[in-house]
C-alpha cells in the first residue's frame, strides 16, 4: 500500500485561532522521530502531539464519502476541498480504514516502526476549516475519524 506523507506549520485558521491543520505533501525523504515527522508542528499541545499522538493517519478512502455526504445534504462547497491532508493528517492511503485497523497494530513505514495508539477524536477546528458547524460531530458519529500513532523506532521515511 502506498502512503502519502504530509506536514504543516502553525498558521491562523480563523482570527485568534492558530492551527497546524494546513498540511502540505512531503515530496522528499524525511525523518520520523518519536515526536512525529520532522518539520511538522502541533500548536495545541494539550490535545495534539506527544508520544501517543506523534502521527495522524486518515484513510483517503473516506474522502468520497464526505463529498457524497455534502452533496446529499445539499450543502455548499466546503472551504477546504475533500482531498488527502484536508483533515490535518500526516499519513493517508487507500485500503486501510477503521474496519481493518486496530489499536496496537504495528506497521513498518520506511525505516520507522509505528503503532496505532488511539482513535482520533476530531475537534471544533474541523468545523472552522470546512465551514460546517457540526462536522466534528458528524465525523464521530460516522466512525470515519482515522487514528493516532506512536513511533516505536525512529527512521527515515519517503513518500
Functional labels for PLM-detected ranges:
Residues 1-128, 134-135:
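Electropositive, beta-rich accessory/interaction domains or terminal extensions
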Residues 133-150:
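A mid-sequence, solvent-exposed acidic-amphipathic segment
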Residues 149-159:
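Well-ordered alpha/beta subsegment
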